[in-house]
């Protein structure tokens, strides 16, 4: 099973994670982390579509290099990839189940990308956190399992692991930006204020393009101090 989660705790820096479980056990070597490349702002649906596309387009590309005659086969794409994995010819097999963290919207975005890649037969579900509802393609009503079932507990475990990895990656990138930031030398900017600025705007370059009034929307920053900060950051 492979599970995807989007983390956008920073409004200008979205990331995603993919965790893989084999026989109910984390396959840590095949975890993946993604920086969202094509989406501006917070858009979970578009971000989910991007990471699904990148993950499975790459697997298909790798499979094509070991099976160049796949286009002449009567097998489906999923059947071909699983046969190659059984023969030991594919670098990594397609999962038995794809899980996306979210409800109908995330599931629809992910399903659309799988269909465009020809992976119509690849099973996929969405697991929504609030009520632990399971959404399936083509089904309007969610599936609700008893909270004490082993199946739901396994789904929750892999979903929570994907969530943990995505958030950890976002925090790692934020710490990296803080370490490298020009704000370190800016008068009147404490470490706490720097963290808030980078979390809100993403980078020094984006802060430079904001007005003092926009920056002052952050708690604890006045228009006057924002003006002084911009003057310092934009100095020649």
Question: Where is each model-derived feature located?
Answer:
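Acidic, glycine-enriched active-site microenvironments
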Residues: 1-236
């Amino acid at each position: 099973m492979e599970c995807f989660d989007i983390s956008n705790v920073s409004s200008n820096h979205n990331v995603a994670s993919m965790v893989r479980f084999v026989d109910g056990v984390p396959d840590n070597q095949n975890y993946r982390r993604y920086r969202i490349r094509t989406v501006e702002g917070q858009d979970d649906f578009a971000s989910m579509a991007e990471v699904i596309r990148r993950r499975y387009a790459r697997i298909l590309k790798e499979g094509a290099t070991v099976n160049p005659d796949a286009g002449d086969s009567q097998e489906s794409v999923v059947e071909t990839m699983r046969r190659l994995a059984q023969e030991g010819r594919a670098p990594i097999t397609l999962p038995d189940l794809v899980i996306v963290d979210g409800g109908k919207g995330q599931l629809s975005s992910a399903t659309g990308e799988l269909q465009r890649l020809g992976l119509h037969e690849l099973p996929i579900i969405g697991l929504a956190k609030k009520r632990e509802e399971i959404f399936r393609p083509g089904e309007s009503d969610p599936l609700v399992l008893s909270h004490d079932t082993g199946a739901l507990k396994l789904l929750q475990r892999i979903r929570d692991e994907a969530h943990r990895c995505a958030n950890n990656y976002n925090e790692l990138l934020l710490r990296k930006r803080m370490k490298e930031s020009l704000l370190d030398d800016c008068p009147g900017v404490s470490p706490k204020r720097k963290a808030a600025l980078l979390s809100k705007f993403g980078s020094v370059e984006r802060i430079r393009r904001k007005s003092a009034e926009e920056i002052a929307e952050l708690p604890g920053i006045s228009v006057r101090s924002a003006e002084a900060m911009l003057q310092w950051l934009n100095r020649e």
